[in-house]
A protein has these predicted regions:
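Ligand-binding clefts of soluble mixed alpha/beta catalytic domains
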Residues: 1-162
């Protein structure tokens, strides 16, 4: 399974909740976890929150996760994060130039938390790759994982969330 991930997140709202986004998302996550084939994820641009998890990350059992240098991987985007971090909110509110303080806070957040090198250092991404090498890196990964053998016990199955 090859995942090319660019997910800005789930669109929150009652329409999605009533439509069963959690239930349907759980079916997809269950399928990832039960799959015994090689699973490779390439994060192209954005990977935020629950939507990032839904694109087969390391915690879901991806064999290899690669990211482009421009990828942004975090719980949420920088502009949203600075709006909810209480110390930053106070600083912006009390500033003479709120726009400049907010822009500096966004830049600081992106540098500290929202880049693939930080995430790779924490072990959530295996490698940060150049976009031009993506095809060759995927081919190499598939070659490396061609002998992967993962089997589930006979007559054992999980409890799929229907």
């Amino acid at each position: 399974m090859l995942f090319r991930s660019d997910v800005p997140g789930f669109l929150p709202g009652t329409g999605q909740e009533y439509g069963g986004i959690i239930r349907h998302g759980a079916k997809m996550l269950y399928a990832y976890c039960e799959a015994t084939v090689p699973k490779i994820t390439v994060i192209l641009r954005n990977a935020y929150g629950g939507a990032y998890i839904g694109m087969c990350n390391k915690e879901l059992g991806a064999d290899l996760v690669m990211a482009w240098p421009t990828a942004q991987i975090a719980v949420m985007g920088a502009s949203g994060a600075v709006n909810i971090i209480s110390s930053v909110k106070k600083e912006i509110k009390n500033a003479e130039d709120p726009d400049a303080v907010r822009a500096a806070a966004i830049e600081d957040y992106e540098e500290k938390f929202n880049n693939p090198y930080v995430v790779a250092g924490l072990g959530y991404v295996d490698d940060v790759i150049e976009p031009a090498t993506t095809r060759q890196r995927i081919i190499s990964a598939l070659d490396m994982l061609s002998t992967k053998r993962e089997s589930l016990p006979a007559k054992k199955h999980g409890n799929i969330p229907l």
